[in-house]
Amino acid sequence: MKNLVRLLAVIALIIGSFWGKVPAQALNLTSIALPSLPVAVLNAADAKLTTEFGAKIDLNNSDIRDFRDLRGFYPNLAGKIIKNAPYEEVEDVLNIPGLSDTQKERLQANLEKFTVTEPSKEFIEGDDRFNPGVY
């Protein structure tokens, strides 16, 4: 008798699992959504990246990580450059107090890789120039 009850329970479970299953249906949102045209939106940071700032290291707006590609700059010399900003001209970076002769030579050799633009709050607010939070 126990075996018969077990057999009927197993058969009921098997039939119930196939019969009671209803496939999920996804909602078609394409008919509900309003058609929209793509719009190019530029904020102040994106607009600045289209200038020379996007191609060179901006001494007034770049963060410390931007100097990693330059040999001998990261982190000490880059930190001095950032601490003494803003600059009026690229050559002003050579007048930073406390630079060694080696550091001045490195700066002189890489002046063409730098640019100077007006400081933008999008890039320099909140001391993000030392730790931009990119990990």
From Swiss-Prot:
Organism superkingdom: Bacteria
Localization of this protein: Cellular thylakoid membrane
GO biological process: photosynthesis; photosystem II stabilization
Pfam entry (one): PsbU
Gene3D superfamilies, alphabetized: Photosystem II 12 kDa extrinsic protein
Keywords associated with the record: Electron transport, Membrane, Photosynthesis, Photosystem II, Signal, Thylakoid, Transport
Cellular compartments per GO CC: extrinsic component of membrane; photosystem II oxygen evolving complex; plasma membrane-derived thylakoid membrane
Signal peptide per UniProt: 1-26
UniProt keyword Oxidoreductase, yes or no: no
InterPro entries attached to this UniProt entry: PSII_PsbU
Predominant place of localization: membrane
Membrane topology: Peripheral membrane protein
Subunit structure: PSII is composed of 1 copy each of membrane proteins PsbA, PsbB, PsbC, PsbD, PsbE, PsbF, PsbH, PsbI, PsbJ, PsbK, PsbL, PsbM, PsbT, PsbX, PsbY, PsbZ, Psb30/Ycf12, peripheral proteins PsbO, CyanoQ (PsbQ), PsbU, PsbV and a large number of cofactors. It forms dimeric complexes.
Family: Belongs to the PsbU family.
Function noted in UniProt: One of the extrinsic, lumenal subunits of photosystem II (PSII). PSII is a light-driven water plastoquinone oxidoreductase, using light energy to abstract electrons from H(2)O, generating a proton gradient subsequently used for ATP formation. The extrinsic proteins stabilize the structure of photosystem II oxygen-evolving complex (OEC), the ion environment of oxygen evolution and protect the OEC against heat-induced inactivation.
Name under which the protein is recorded: Photosystem II extrinsic protein U
Species the sequence originates in: Microcystis aeruginosa (strain NIES-843 / IAM M-2473)
